[in-house]
A protein has these predicted regions:
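Cytosolic regulatory regions built on CNB/CRP/Popeye-like sensor folds
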Residues: 1-149
Length: 149
């Protein structure tokens, strides 16, 4: 089970069965233990992740504060690679035993280019979700001060 577990998620809305099958073929399921680091801030952005089971804490360290987000099943992270950013801008750690699906950036890029119609749908879905996250983050920031470190 990999991409099939995410079939109903917004990221995959409107994608053809063939495209999903090709995506599934390049996806790798991995089990993570509590405390495992999946991504380190500043590491090369080479993989995109989907959280199938468990909890992943994303922590972005800034000059005078840090921001943390807790991802739950169905969420994705490591999306710096989709924006062609050379490095991740946050770290990701497994908070409890978790199962993720990892997709290598080069393989995902090749698939998106090979099937531009589904590729565009995927990117639009991605942009819609990320845009919503930014709106929610901005709204939360209006109510809660930054965490001082």
């Amino acid at each position: 089970m990999s991409i099939k577990a995410f079939k109903g998620q917004r990221l995959f809305k409107g994608l053809s069965q063939d495209f999903l099958a090709q995506l599934d073929a390049i996806a790798v399921q991995e089990s993570k233990e509590k405390g495992d680091i999946l991504i380190r801030n500043g590491d090369p952005a080479k993989n995109f992740y989907l959280l199938e089971e468990g909890r992943i804490c994303i922590r972005a360290e800034r000059k005078n504060h840090s921001v943390s987000f807790l991802h739950t099943p169905g969420d994705f992270f490591g999306w710096s690679c989709l924006l062609d950013r050379p490095a991740y801008s946050a770290s990701a750690e497994s908070v409890i035993p978790s199962r993720v699906v990892r997709i290598e950036k080069k393989k995902l890029d090749a698939l998106l280019k090979k099937d531009p119609l589904n590729g565009l749908t995927f990117i639009k879905n991605f942009a819609d979700i990320i845009g919503g996250r930014f709106l929610n983050t901005h709204s939360a920031h209006d109510w809660f001060p930054a965490i001082e470190t």
